[in-house]
Amino acid sequence: MNDYLEIIDVVARQILDSRCFPTVEVEVYLEDGTIGRAAVPSGASTGMYEAVELRDGDKDKYLGKGVLTAVQNVNDTIAEALIGCNVFDQPYIDKMLIELDGTDNKGKLGANAILGVSLAVANAAANALGLSLYKYVGGVNAKVLPVPMMNIINGGSHADNSVDLQEFMIMPVGATSFTEALRMCAEVYHTLKNTLKDKGYATGLGDEGGFAPNLKSNAEAIDVIIEAITKAGYKAGEDMFIAIDAASSEYYKDGKYVLENEGKTLTSAEMVDFFEDWVNKYPIISIEDGMAEEDWDGWKLLNERLGKKVQLVGDDLFVTNTERLEKGIEIGAANSILIKLNQIGTLTETLNAIEMANRAGYTAVISHRSGETEDTTISDLVVAVNAGQIKTGAPARSERVAKYNQLLRIEEELEDVAEYRGKKAFFNIKK
């Protein structure tokens, strides 16, 4: 096997994401004619500690959301540095990209520029070897298909409705394969649509393909999902569990949690009580961002109260950053990390965060963003690292479905080697 292959060109362009905003797409060209391509996602609710997504700010073009500066940074500064590099030396290339930027948050060149290059390099290397990306990144032991954390009711900043919490999801832990898991979720999704219609609710979709009805309360979202699970022929708490992304930083104001649509203002302790009541009442297996990104004491209390029986996922809390994750591990905040490639900006840093989480006994959930493209890198990544869980929206809208379809292909390719762990993917809780 050739272990040296030069990069001969790097080309970026501005494309559109699923929310009709510009994003960066990068192609890396190799001396043997191989091409690797990657497109960068973008978030709606973003943590304050995320790596910087560079936007042009020109109000006359795409309402200031253009990314031509990031594109130019790739085509000029980054391309000049990468041409002649060995495509198989991913850690070196990622280190060089970080040093080329020179800032703590990738604010000079833009995390959207840097990530596009980092992922395109990995795709080019895999293509040159004739390997699937998951095999190139994960090696011979990459075999675990993920339990989907499927968003079927959207609220918060992902929808224009009366629901405070951002995402209500289903997790088909009772399935025996990813193929079966996807079918189960699709059946519940269609059943939920009919259930909402029967109740007189609208069935318009949010950013991630979930329904966005104006429900009477946050709890009604769970009630109607459980009803749909039952009508679809499954048992909530056995075949399917509920997962929530509270996105609490979005309604954390002056040290309090303001649930405007319910007319409640809660302290950190009261917010923990709120979730504990729900966990005791409903078959909830995972809560993401239950507390705000700066409420470390609240996170610690939440973990003390619920961390043995519910997965507590830090998204805005950790932003795929090893420094923040290390602090969380030290003080006992959360027991899981959400992994978003564009929060940190390179493949190598992402893999480092997953490794740190695993060493600490934390689960890792590989995630999309609300602004997505047809790029399926995260589908390969979740199998490469055997994470066992993926969060990539509803089984609707092609930018979400593309990820699920890629996982179907991977499961087919792995054949009998493929593992679907179901409830065992939650290895650090008792449920």
Swiss-Prot record:
Pfam families: Enolase_C, Enolase_N. SUPFAM superfamilies: Enolase C-terminal domain-like, Enolase N-terminal domain-like. It catalyses: (2R)-2-phosphoglycerate = phosphoenolpyruvate + H2O. GO terms for biological process: glycolytic process. It comes from the Bacteria. Mg(2+) binds at residues 245, 288, 315. The keyword Flavoprotein does not apply. Catalyzes the reversible conversion of 2-phosphoglycerate (2-PG) into phosphoenolpyruvate (PEP). It is essential for the degradation of carbohydrates via glycolysis. InterPro entries: Enolase (IPR000941), Enolase-like_C_sf (IPR036849), Enolase-like_N (IPR029017), Enolase_C (IPR020810), Enolase_CS (IPR020809), Enolase_N (IPR020811). The keyword Transferase does not apply. Its EC number is 4.2.1.11. Belongs to the enolase family. It comes from Clostridium botulinum (strain Eklund 17B / Type B). The active site is at 208 (proton donor), 340 (proton acceptor). This is Enolase.
